[in-house]
UniProtKB/Swiss-Prot annotation:
This is Large ribosomal subunit protein bL27. Keywords: Ribonucleoprotein, Ribosomal protein. GO terms for biological process: translation. One of its GO terms (cellular component) is cytosolic large ribosomal subunit. The gene is rpmA. Residues 1-22 are annotated as: Disordered. The lineage of its organism: Bacteria, Pseudomonadati, Pseudomonadota, Alphaproteobacteria, Hyphomicrobiales. Belongs to the bacterial ribosomal protein bL27 family. NCBIfam families: L27 (TIGR00062). It comes from Rhizobium etli (strain ATCC 51251 / DSM 11541 / JCM 21823 / NBRC 15573 / CFN 42).
Length: 89
């Protein structure tokens, strides 16, 4: 009888969906309030001035301005938003 016996199935072939983490706005880029600057797990980047820290450690802008990254003496990188200077009228 020319029958082919059923082959076993692989138990591999799955992967989790990517989480799209990382820097979304780089140094010098303009942001408005509410823009996400960094998506991260844990605090690889720390919040500086004019930014908020979400419960999932997302850093987001609280004011409009330009993104600034600073490394302090403790080795931590702080993310801030420098407000745009108001135009003199």
């Amino acid at each position: 009888m020319a029958h082919k016996k059923a082959g076993g199935s692989s138990r591999n072939g799955r992967d989790s969906e990517s989480k799209r983490l990382g820097v979304k706005k780089f140094g010098g880029e303009a942001v408005i309030a509410g823009n996400i600057i960094v998506r991260q797990r844990g605090t690889q980047w720390h919040p500086g001035s004019n930014v908020g820290l979400g419960k999932d450690h997302t850093i987001f802008a609280l004011t409009a301005g330009n993104v600034d990254y600073r490394t302090k003496a403790n080795g931590r990188v702080y993310v801030s938003v420098m407000p745009k200077a108001e135009a003199a009228e």
